[in-house]
């Protein structure tokens, strides 16, 4: 009797374990995430006007690009997401040549500014788009291994967009997958970041600066009410602590911090000359009230915010990272991140010397115009069409098992 009971218990245990394994491997048990859209957010982004779609039609002669991203605008408006969307919307100005899709966890199945978006965990839609795509793109390190795997089995080129020092450190020594046979492409956002991986082959490595069109951020003089020293994204790396120190040291000046979409935000209440505002898609409203833009970053590989601010003629005070030096050149004033007195002295000079302030405004605007992105975009289009596209190879789609465990 004991043997029978023990055998039954053993068999039951085997069945339970087997069921769990089957559900894990073949059931749709992946983690889910929904993008929460509050009524206020929906109104701000005019969500009700976003077209819905149901059909994944053939791309015909167009180059179909599939991005796989952990976040996307307008729900997260960080630099990488804005950069990807700017590229996508530009490519979609030529819908006869390019067709861009974005898969991101929880994203509603809608078209946002001509780019069709959907939930990464919508397995049926993902498979349909993947099957018809010609290129795979991503800047999300958390999906890097999955993208390399998909490129390997499908034969589709993988374009890897690199924006941060942390991304480079995370990849480590072994960057390229030799099994991809010339279809693994890497794009760095600056010369300084590219130099951190000088070992990568020139043939499959490019530099494309983040696209910021000064025309999109220019603010008419009559709409400007410059008042604040502004810091965008108040996490530790961007200088959230220094913003608080400056507000304490300069009680006669007004400061504002824009809450960012990633990393812990450093905030402080109780200072009458310091306020915080939510990050927004209406960033020109922020620049219209900005007197000086500060960027006391510990790491900054380029400086999209800097170019946006310069486009409005806003003087810049920044830390001396290689990326900010490359981006701003002589158009910014540089201070050591750890030198509070240096920041205080520089801001006081801008406040007390109007001629100096006006000259810094003029050189900022000149630099923004010098960074006209149109030639850069034309070069990107040609590269995608003439170099990346021909690297497409025959392949296969993921199996049911592979699809189910791919983005857990």
Where would I find each of the regions flagged by the language model?
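A charged, aromatic-enriched C-terminal amphipathic alpha-helix characteristic of glycosyltransferases
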Residues: 355-393
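Short alpha-helical donor nucleotide-sugar binding micro-motif in glycosyltransferases
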Residues: 130, 279-280, 285-290
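Aromatic "clamp/platform" in nucleotide-sugar-dependent glycosyltransferases that forms part
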Residues: 298
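Conserved acidic donor-binding segment of nucleotide-sugar-dependent glycosyltransferases
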Residues: 234, 332-340, 349-354
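Short His-centered aromatic/hydrophobic patch
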Residues: 138-144, 162
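Conserved catalytic-core segment of nucleotide-activated headgroup transferases in glycan assembly
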Residues: 199, 213-270, 276
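Short hydrophobic beta-strand element within catalytic cores of glycosyltransferases
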Residues: 315-318
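Donor nucleotide-sugar binding/catalytic pocket of nucleotide-sugar-dependent glycosyltransferases
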Residues: 167, 182-218
């Amino acid at each position: 009797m004991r043997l029978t009971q023990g055998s039954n218990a053993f068999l039951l245990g085997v069945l339970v374990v087997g069921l769990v394994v089957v559900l894990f491997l073949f059931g749709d048990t992946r983690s889910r995430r929904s993008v929460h859209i509050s009524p206020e957010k929906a109104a701000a982004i005019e969500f009700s006007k976003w077209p819905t779609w149901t059909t994944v039609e053939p791309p015909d002669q167009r180059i179909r690009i599939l991005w796989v991203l952990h976040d996307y605008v307008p729900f997260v408006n960080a630099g990488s997401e804005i950069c990807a969307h700017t590229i996508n919307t530009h490519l979609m100005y030529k819908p006869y040549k390019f067709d861009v899709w974005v898969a991101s966890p929880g994203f509603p199945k809608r078209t946002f500014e001509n780019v069709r978006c959907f939930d990464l965990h919508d397995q049926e839609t993902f498979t349909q788009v993947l099957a018809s795509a010609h290129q795979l793109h991503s800047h999300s390190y958390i999906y890097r291994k999955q993208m390399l795997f998909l490129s390997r089995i499908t034969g589709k080129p993988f374009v890897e967009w690199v924006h941060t020092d942390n991304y480079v450190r995370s990849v480590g020594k072994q960057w390229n997958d030799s099994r991809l046979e010339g279809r693994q492409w890497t794009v760095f956002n600056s010369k300084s970041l590219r130099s951190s991986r000088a070992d990568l082959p020139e043939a499959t490595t490019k530099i494309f600066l983040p696209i910021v069109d000064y025309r999109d951020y220019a603010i008419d003089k009559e709409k400007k009410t410059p008042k604040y020293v502004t810091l965008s994204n108040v996490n530790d790396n961007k200088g959230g602590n220094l913003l608080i120190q400056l507000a304490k040291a300069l009680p006669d000046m007004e400061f504002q911090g824009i809450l960012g979409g990633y990393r812990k935000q450093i905030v402080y209440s109780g200072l009458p000359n310091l306020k915080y505002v939510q990050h927004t898609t209406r960033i020109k409203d922020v620049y219209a009230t900005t007197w000086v833009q500060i960027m006391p970053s510990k790491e900054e590989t380029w400086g999209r915010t800097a170019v946006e601010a310069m486009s409005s003629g806003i003087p810049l005070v920044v830390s001396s990272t290689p990326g900010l030096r490359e981006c701003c050149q002589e158009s910014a004033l540089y201070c050591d991140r750890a030198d509070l007195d240096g920041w205080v002295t520089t801001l006081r000079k801008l406040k007390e010397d109007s001629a100096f302030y006006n000259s810094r405004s003029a050189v900022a605007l000149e630099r923004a115009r010098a960074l006209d992105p149109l030639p850069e975009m034309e070069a990107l289009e040609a590269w995608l069409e003439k170099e990346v596209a021909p690297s497409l190879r025959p392949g296969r789609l993921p199996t049911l098992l592979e699809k189910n465990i791919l983005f857990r």
